């Protein structure tokens, strides 16, 4: 850790043994720091049969990685364009790093913070983006049928073959919001699908079929629970699998420096019929900056709609 924090411009060559705890440490540092570049080389050495080297890393924790490993390099991921917030810039950099891989991603953030928009930005080259809210699945049967699909005659009402959401998202991204609402049974089945082969293909099976279908899609999960709360609600193995690449999205009350930008973005995206200019009254902006906005973008949207109605009303009154 000391080496990486003091030698930021060096392209290291790292020698590790395959399958060891050292390897896991290296990949954790790689995924969390983004300091390492494509010039960093990992070389597999001999297979170490002894236990002694592994013992040095038994107490290693992700939390020990210093924050100064996270570089200030630019990012191609711009959900928060021209942000002045360090926490939002970190979201951009993390997403930029993760979408270059085929790994699943977990978005953690409060309601109304725009998790679906961030997930949508992870889609490459106009490929498919499929989304579902896990809270909408009434029971396990519906959840399984929606996710994995079914064959004709698999159950009462199955009048024809139907693709599941996983197949629909083949080649693209499947976004599952409120993942904490999935039952343990569905988590177990989904966990099996997450076990990909060497080519990063998933194997899924429709209800009523004996045939496995290979697909390739990225799963982006989202929750408004904290990580500790989520851990209590998910199967341990499923939890361990989906928290490997976590992106924490800051609430609007923690990104005051971007409040004007957020206001302008919300206003422009509402598509008012008369297309009024974005209000930039000093008193209004100062007031907006004082708001906590616990509903995040939804609260800001309500304010914009309310303001537009009464601004137009006042303008029309002046003309009378």
Please name every model-derived segment.
Residues 139-145, 161-200, 217-221, 227-240, ...:
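Conserved AAA+/SF3 P-loop NTPase catalytic/coupling segment centered on the Walker-B
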Residues 1-13, 37, 316:
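A broadly used, surface-exposed interaction patch
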Residues 100, 118, 123-126, 207-218, ...:
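Nucleotide-binding/hydrolysis machinery
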Residues 11-72:
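Interdomain "pre-motor" coupling segment immediately N-terminal to P-loop NTPase/helicase cores
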Residues 6-8, 33-42, 125-126, 272-275:
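Structural alpha-beta junctions
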Residues 154-160, 197-206:
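Short gly/ser/thr-rich secondary-structure transition/capping motifs
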Residues 76-156, 172-173, 178-180, 251-256:
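Conserved post-Walker A coupling segment in P-loop NTPases
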């Amino acid at each position: 850790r000391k080496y990486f924090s003091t030698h930021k411009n060096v392209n290291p060559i790292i020698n590790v043994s395959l399958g060891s705890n050292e390897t896991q440490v290296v990949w954790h540092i790689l995924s969390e720091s983004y300091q390492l570049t494509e010039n960093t080389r990992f070389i597999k050495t001999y297979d170490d049969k002894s236990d002694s080297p592994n013992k040095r890393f038994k107490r290693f924790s992700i939390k020990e990685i210093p924050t100064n490993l996270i570089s200030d390099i630019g990012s191609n991921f711009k959900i928060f364009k021209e942000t002045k917030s360090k926490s939002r810039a970190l979201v951009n950099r993390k997403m930029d790093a993760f979408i270059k891989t085929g790994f699943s991603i977990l978005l953690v953030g409060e309601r109304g913070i725009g998790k679906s928009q961030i997930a949508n930005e992870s889609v490459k080259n106009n490929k498919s983006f499929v989304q579902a809210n896990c809270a909408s699945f009434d029971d396990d049967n519906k959840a399984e049928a929606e996710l994995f699909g079914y064959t004709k005659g698999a159950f009462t009402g199955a009048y024809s073959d139907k693709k599941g959401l996983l197949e629909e998202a083949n080649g693209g991204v499947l976004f599952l919001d409120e993942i904490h609402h999935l039952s343990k049974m569905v988590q177990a089945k989904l966990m099996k699908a997450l076990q990909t082969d060497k080519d990063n293909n998933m194997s899924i099976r429709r209800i009523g079929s004996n045939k496995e279908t290979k697909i390739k899609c990225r799963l982006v999960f989202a929750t408004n629970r904290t990580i500790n709360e989520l851990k209590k609600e998910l199967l341990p193995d499923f939890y361990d699998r989906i928290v490997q690449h976590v992106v924490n999205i800051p609430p609007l009350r923690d990104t005051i420096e971007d409040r004007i930008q957020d206001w302008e973005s919300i206003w422009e995206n509402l598509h008012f019929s008369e297309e009024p200019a974005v209000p930039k009254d000093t008193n209004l902006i100062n007031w907006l900056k004082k708001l906590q906005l616990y509903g995040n973008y939804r609260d800001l949207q309500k304010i914009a709609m309310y303001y537009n109605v009464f601004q137009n009303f006042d303008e029309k009154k002046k003309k009378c």
